[in-house]
Amino acid sequence: MAAKDVKFGNDARVKMLRGVNVLADAVKVTLGPKGRNVVLDKSFGAPVITKDGVSVAREIELEDKFENMGAQMVKEVASKANDSAGDGTTTATVLAQSIVNEGLKAVAAGMNPMDLKRGIDKAVVAAVEELKKLSVPCSDPKAIAQVGTISANSDETVGKLIAQAMDKVGKEGVITVEEGSGLQDELDVVEGMQFDRGYLSPYFVNKPESGTVELEHPFILLADKKISNIREMLPILESVAKSGKPLLIIAEDVEGEALATLVVNNMRGIVKVTAVKAPGFGDRRKAMLQDIAILTSGTVISEEIGLELEKATLEDMGQAKRVLITKDATTIIDGVGNKSSIDSRVAQINQQRDEATSDYDREKLQERVAKLAGGVAVIKVGAATEVEMKEKKARVEDALHATRAAVEEGVVAGGGVALIRVANAIRNLCGDNEDQNVGIKVARRAMEAPLRQIMANAGEEPSVIANNVRSGEGNTGYNAATEKYGNMIELGILDPTKVTRSALQYAASIAGLMITTECMVTELPKEDKPDLGGGNPGGAGGMGGMM
C-alpha cells in the first residue's frame, strides 16, 4: 500500500479552499448575458470554446492533490446540477463557492462546523419552499421560447426553435439536437421512437465527449430472449460485418460471454455494435418489441413463433436512419417502416386502449401510441466552423434541458432575483443555537452570489445593484443585457424553478460536507528513482532515459 500524506484542521481546509476557488473562478466567468467564454485545450483537434459551466468544470484537474480534492468536490456540484436539471451548473458552482468561503471563515472564527451545516440545511429547506411559492407555470410557447433564449445565452433563434419543436411533438415529445450541414439552424420532424433503456456497457460509447452512442443507418436485431451464448449470434454478426453497417441489438438481456464478445469486437472495430435491453416487462415487452419491428420494418426473433437466432438473416433486421443511445435512453430516428403499417398498428393500440378496464393499462397503451405516432423533432444546428458548431450545439442542448425543466416545475424571475427574494423571505428563520443562526446567514448571503457575479461579469458594481434589487419587490430586478431595472418575468428573463432549486440544493449539500472536513488524506507522489548509469542490463545500454 502506498504511503499517504495527511493534513489536519486549518492546513487541510486552506488547501481545499484554494482548489474550490480555482475551479469556481474558472467557471463563474461564464455566468449571465455578458459572461465570457472559456477556451479548453484538447489533446487532439481544435480547442473547444464554451460558455457551459459543467464543460469547464470537467476539464479541471489540479497538480496539488489536496487542492484537487476541493476542486473535484465542486465539480461534483456542477455535474449533479447538470444531471438533474440539465442547466444551472454555473449558478450551482457560484453558490457552492460562496457557502464554502463564508462557512470556513465562520469555522476559523470558532463556530461549530456541524451546527453551521445544520443551519445551512435549515435555510435551504425553507428557501426551496419559498421558491415553490414564487414559481409560475410555463405552458405557452412565448414563455417556453424565452426560457430557451435565456439558457442559450440570449440567442432568440434557439429559443424559438425549441418552442416550435415542442409545439410539433408535444411537451413530452422527443427532441434531439444534431450538427447541421448549413449556416442556418433547421427544425425537422421525423418518424421516430424513444424508450428508457440505455447501452449495456460503457465500452460501446463512440462519442466520449457526450458519453453517447451514435449509429448511422444501422441494422436493428430484435430478440425476445436473453442472449448469453455468442455462438447463436455468429451468423448474423458475420453478415453485418460484411455489410459494413453498424448493428443495434435490442433483446430481453445480453449477458456473460455474449456481451464480452460484442464489446471486444466493437473496440477492435471488427463490427460496430451496441446492445440495449428491450423496454417494458412480460407481455408489454413483447408488444413494444413488435412496435419497434413495425417502425423499423424488422422481425422480432422469438422462439414462440418458431424463429431462431442462429437462422436470422439481414432480411429479418430492422433499419433506421440514425440511432442515438445514452446511458439511460435509446432514440430510433426515421425507421424505414411502412407508413400504412405504422398507422394500422396505432389504430390497433387505440382500440385496445378504448377497451382497457384499468387506468394503468390505458396510460401505458397511450404511451405506446405517443412513441409510435408522435415522431421525433430534430434540431439541426448551423454554424460556419467546426469549433462554433460544437459550442453552439452544447448551448442548444442546455437550452432544451432548461426548457423541459421549466415545463415540469414552472419558472421564477431570472437574473438572480428569485434567490434574493427567497433570502429576504427567510430572514426571520432561527436555528436551535447561535452557530446554526450563523449557518442560516451563510446560506442567505450565498443566495446573493449569483446576482453579484452576473453584475461583475457585466462590468457593473455588484453591491449597488444587489442593494437596489433587495429594496425592490416582487419580480423587479436588473437586466444586465440592457442595463435597466424592470419586471424580470415581463422582460422574459426567466429561470426554470427546477434549475434554481437543484443548484441551491446540490451546492448546499456538498459545501456543507466540505465545511465539516477536519482531515484530508491523499497518496504521496512517487519519487522517481535516480538512474544508476551504465545502461540497462540485457544490452539496452544508453536507452535508460528514453520512453
From Swiss-Prot:
Binding sites annotated in the UniProt record for ATP: 30-33, 51, 87-91, 415, 479-481, 495
GO cellular component, one term: cytoplasm
Major localisation: cytoplasm
Catalytic activity as recorded in UniProt: ATP + H2O + a folded polypeptide = ADP + phosphate + an unfolded polypeptide
SUPFAM superfamilies assigned to the protein according to its UniProt record, in alphabetical order: GroEL apical domain-like, GroEL equatorial domain-like, GroEL-intermediate domain like
Region listing for Disordered, in residue ranges: 525-547
InterPro entries, A to Z: Chaperonin_Cpn60_CS, Cpn60/GroEL, Cpn60/GroEL/TCP-1, GroEL-like_apical_dom_sf, GROEL-like_equatorial_sf, TCP-1-like_intermed_sf
Single Gene Ontology MF annotation: ATP-dependent protein folding chaperone
Top-level division of the source organism's lineage: Bacteria
Sorted UniProt keywords: ATP-binding, Chaperone, Cytoplasm, Isomerase, Nucleotide-binding
Pfam family, one: Cpn60_TCP1
Subcellular location per the Swiss-Prot or TrEMBL entry: Cytoplasm
Subunit (UniProt): Forms a cylinder of 14 subunits composed of two heptameric rings stacked back-to-back. Interacts with the co-chaperonin GroES.
Biological function: Together with its co-chaperonin GroES, plays an essential role in assisting protein folding. The GroEL-GroES system forms a nano-cage that allows encapsulation of the non-native substrate proteins and provides a physical environment optimized to promote and accelerate protein folding.
NCBIfam families xrefs: GroEL, PRK00013.1, PRK12849.1, PRK12850.1, PRK12851.1
Family: Belongs to the chaperonin (HSP60) family.
Full protein name: Chaperonin GroEL
Species name: Blochmanniella floridana
Upper lineage: Bacteria, Pseudomonadati, Pseudomonadota, Gammaproteobacteria, Enterobacterales
